[in-house]
Amino acid sequence: MAINAQEISALIKQQIENFKPNFDVTETGVVTYIGDGIARAHGLENVMSGELLNFENGSYGMAQNLESTDVGIIILGDFTDIREGDTIRRTGKIMEVPVGESLIGRVVDPLGRPVDGLGEIHTDKTRPVEAPAPGVMQRKSVSEPLQTGLKAIDALVPIGRGQRELIIGDRQTGKTTIAIDTILNQKDQDMICIYVAIGQKESTVRTQVETLRQYGALDYTIVVTASASQPSPLLFLAPYTGVAMAEEFMYQGKHVLIVYDDLSKQAVAYRELSLLLRRPPGREAFPGDVFYLHSRLLERSAKVSDELGGGSITALPFIETQAGDISAYIATNVISITDGQIFLGDGLFNAGIRPAIDAGSSVSRVGGSAQIKAMKKVAGTLRIDLASYRELEAFTKFGSDLDAATQAKLNRGRRTVEVLKQPVHKPLPVEKQVTILYALTHGFLDTVPVDDIVRFEEEFHAFFDAQHPEILETIRDTKDLPEEAVLDAAITEFLNQSSFQ
């Protein structure tokens, strides 16, 4: 058999042409330090800031510090199996979380993994946790109200869709209750709610989830939880995960309410990470970019232009103060980023005034333009009246004689305080808020004993539901008050047949 050299060379040539190398090139490094949710690695020459990295044990990390000799990495998950000398690989991707409709009604961790025991979440959509906020020309001014169902907020410090309203106060002053009540009030309001629990006790989160489920609010709510027992990288990441999920809905033209409970714990977690990464500490040992930590998060809440779908993200960030000190570092940072704040005083809370909103220190910078006409008319002077009542009340403690005008102001003030009280998890529709506040500001409650105000209000709402539903309907549909004579006649009719006259 003759060997044909030409055939053999053609065959070899064909084999070479058809050869496909079965390998992929991945840049790897070596772990040089591990501990407290932080790793350092050598050899990742081209890694990007914020890039996702893969450890040998399957855990992921995120590149934070890019230094001349090594890379500082925060570990997202369990770091107990990682050892010095382990190999670490680049993924070439930045941190992304699952988003979309299938997350609604679920409880997830900051990586988007379910923690409620209800099985896998099936979604093929993801969004990066860090994303640029909408630009100046991509935004619209706040014009639609977000009804919290709480008289004290909707009347005194109204919130609009797309606003950032800080809720600030000491621990145990009812901050979370305000947020949960606001979420409950979004039922049938075409809103999606996201509750981000940062550094909370797991038992507390369980209680909140059960409350939401009991009132049917879990049907339109996503809960993101990073409990106190989890490593600080997850606490740092949780708010960004929540807002990434919210952005998916906002850019579809939907309206979202997101609650960050609370950002003080996120700042503490970030301080811990920064100190472990050897970043230079600043005031109160926080790193220099702690303002940017919160500003880049809260700037992603907006009312976007019609070209982008006209959706919105309304943010309710929480800050916990120490002994009512709202001039602390993190508190003043967040106050300067947000569009107003609701200050909860422990003195008011302990005196039984709940929600314990301090009208003097609370403000809504843009919510006034979103308030409905009816509420503007009845609550126009309520803030000033309440503030002057508190001032007068302080003076009366000295026991001086009072003229009739001052006495009338004090009487109206006491009734105002009683009307603005509200039981837990009982948000009130805006049309009912308007009717009771109208009765208050037009002097119909001046003869009702202060101790009977709560009972008066219950019977008052029941009367309007039964006898005058058309008045409530008019307020709900037109967003304005009906003729004053109609309202006055209805309230007088109630007073005549009640025991309060």
UniProtKB/Swiss-Prot annotation:
The record marks S362 as: Required for activity. It catalyses: ATP + H2O + 4 H(+)(in) = ADP + phosphate + 5 H(+)(out). Pfam families: ATP-synt_ab, ATP-synt_ab_C, ATP-synt_ab_N. Keywords: ATP synthesis, ATP-binding, Cell membrane, CF(1), Hydrogen ion transport, Ion transport, Membrane, Nucleotide-binding, Translocase, Transport. InterPro entries: ATP_synth_asu-like_sf (IPR023366), ATP_synth_asu_C (IPR000793), ATP_synth_asu_C_sf (IPR038376), ATP_synth_F1_a_nt-bd_dom (IPR033732), ATP_synth_F1_asu (IPR005294), ATPase_F1/V1/A1_a/bsu_N (IPR004100), ATPase_F1/V1/A1_a/bsu_N_sf (IPR036121), ATPase_F1/V1/A1_a/bsu_nucl-bd (IPR000194). SUPFAM superfamilies: C-terminal domain of alpha and beta subunits of F1 ATP synthase, N-terminal domain of alpha and beta subunits of F1 ATP synthase, P-loop containing nucleoside triphosphate hydrolases. CDD domains: ATP-synt_F1_alpha_C, ATP-synt_F1_alpha_N, F1-ATPase_alpha_CD. It is a peripheral membrane protein. One of its GO terms (cellular component) is plasma membrane. It is found in: Cell membrane. ATP binds at G169, D170, R171, Q172, T173, G174, K175, T176. NCBIfam families: atpA, PRK13343.1. Belongs to the ATPase alpha/beta chains family. F-type ATPases have 2 components, CF(1) - the catalytic core - and CF(0) - the membrane proton channel. CF(1) has five subunits: alpha(3), beta(3), gamma(1), delta(1), epsilon(1). CF(0) has three main subunits: a(1), b(2) and c(9-12). The alpha and beta chains form an alternating ring which encloses part of the gamma chain. CF(1) is attached to CF(0) by a central stalk formed by the gamma and epsilon chains, while a peripheral stalk is formed by the delta and b chains. This is ATP synthase subunit alpha. The lineage of its organism: Bacteria, Bacillati, Bacillota, Bacilli, Lactobacillales. The gene is atpA.
